[in-house]
Amino acid sequence: MAFDRLKMPIGDAMFTQRSVRRFKSDPIPIEDIHLIIDAAVKAPNGGNRQIGRFLVLTDRNVIREFGTIYHEAWWAKRKEERGWTKRADIPPEEKNYKLASELADEMKDVPCVVFACAVPPGTANSVIPATQNLMLAAHSLGIGSVPTTLHPTVMDRFRAMFAIPKDVAFHFCIPLGYPRTAYGSSRRRPTSETTYLNRWGAPVPWT
């Protein structure tokens, strides 16, 4: 696998990566998907047990069918957590939820979706690093992504739709596609507010 195609410097990849929820419909070449998944499995994993598994969707009809389930799952979670049942319920100040609700509508049209799962014991500690590797590799190829989840309401139907065994743990749904709009760098709180030195609450020597 020609991993030298991932030419973006690691610093650029990490510091310019951000969640992308608006995608073009252009298909992603299968060789790029292959490279992205190869990058994912190179991530650290507990005991080198390699329990991570990836189910990749590229069939438009299958993605469209999954999009219906994803839409239902997204709104089920919003109703449970916030009492929202439609976009008009989302307060104006909750801009991130507005954007996420657009993905709930558009998931059916994305060119590729990856499900990050794990075989028994099914823990996420090996899947989370792989998912980040996957998204960084995609970013290096100009492909946007965002990690999302589902809701218990749809899990039985989700498993049946894709013949996923009961003992396989689902962790993330990751849509992939070329960004439809230009994005700036992400905004984060200063690490001086979120990091401590030697003892909880003790400040770090930077601002």
Language model feature labels by segment:
Residues 2-6, 97-99, 172-207:
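C-terminal helix-cap and adjacent tail motif
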Residues 9-26:
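Generic N-terminal amphipathic, Lys/Arg-enriched alpha-helix
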Residues 14, 36-40, 174:
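Short alpha-helical scaffolding segments that buttress acidic/His motifs in well-ordered protein cores
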Residues 29:
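Conserved, non-catalytic sequence blocks in retroelement Pol enzymes and Pol-derived host proteins
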Residues 35-40, 112-161:
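Small-aliphatic-rich amphipathic alpha-helix that forms the alpha element of a beta-alpha
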Residues 41-49:
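Glycine-rich phosphate/pyrophosphate-binding beta-alpha loops
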Residues 50-126:
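Glycine/small-residue-rich phosphate/adenosyl-binding loop
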Residues 75-86, 162-187:
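A glycine-rich helix N-cap at a beta->alpha junction
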